């Protein structure tokens, strides 16, 4: 499943959901609080880590604040993301042809739609893209998953390359 939607609300959470994915018990509460505290935020992302085979947390990924240059090199935004529903609609939502990297494709198009905000993610003094620096997503490592090996799903790399190529083609 690629997206969880809060249908009645204004927020969409494109979240890669796997049977072994775990959210921190307070993850949705922290996201809701952040949305309430930062009503102008268009996109909110969090830090994450992995769970080893024994279920122990490891490999924390403490992400930087918004960096358009880094996004072009990799999808550092990751898995737990909240985006304004209108923004997802404005960029056309998920595209089937980027299966395996739909989230990266969507993030690249959102950044472009927002005018590629400068580092820090602020537009007109308001937080357009906000980093919530808390580990709220735990990704279980297992064989056959990109959580264990970036080469586990070659089609995802190809889809990511296609998404980036399209983003750069429209930008330049």
Placement of each model-derived feature along the sequence:
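Non-catalytic membrane-proximal stalk/linker segments that position and tether the catalytic domains
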Residues: 1-2, 6, 24, 62, ...
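Short beta-strand-to-loop acidic/aromatic patch adjacent to the donor-nucleotide binding site
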Residues: 3, 9-22
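Conserved beta-strand scaffold positions in the cores of enzyme catalytic domains, especially
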Residues: 3, 43, 129-131
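Alpha-helical elements of Rossmann-like donor-binding domains used by nucleotide-donor carbohydrate transfer enzymes
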Residues: 4, 26-33, 105-109, 159, ...
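Conserved donor NDP-sugar-binding/catalytic core segment of glycosyltransferases
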Residues: 22-59, 86, 126-127, 142
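Phosphate/oxyanion-binding loops and surfaces in catalytic or ligand/nucleic-acid-binding neighborhoods
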Residues: 34, 38, 113, 139, ...
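Acidic/His-rich active-site region of diverse nucleotide-sugar glycosyltransferases
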Residues: 43-78, 134
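Conserved nucleotide-sugar donor-binding catalytic segment
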Residues: 68-158, 162
């Amino acid at each position: 499943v690629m997206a969880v939607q809060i249908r009645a609300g204004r927020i969409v959470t494109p979240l890669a959901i796997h049977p072994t994915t775990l959210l921190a018990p307070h993850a949705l509460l922290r996201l809701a609080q952040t949305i309430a505290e930062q009503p102008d935020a268009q996109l909110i992302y969090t830090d994450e880590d992995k769970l080893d085979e024994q279920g122990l947390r490891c490999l924390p990924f403490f992400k930087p604040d918004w960096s358009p240059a880094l996004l072009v090199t990799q999808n550092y935004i990751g898995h737990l993301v909240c985006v304004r529903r209108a923004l997802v609609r404005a960029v056309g939502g998920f595209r089937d042809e980027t299966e395996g990297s739909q989230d990266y494709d969507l993030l690249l198009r959102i950044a472009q739609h927002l005018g590629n905000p400068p580092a820090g993610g602020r537009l007109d003094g308001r937080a357009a893209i906000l980093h919530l620096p808390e580990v709220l997503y735990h990704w279980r490592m297992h064989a056959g998953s990109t959580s264990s090996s970036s080469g586990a799903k070659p089609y995802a790399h190809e889809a990511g390359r296609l998404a980036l190529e399209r983003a750069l083609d429209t930008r330049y």
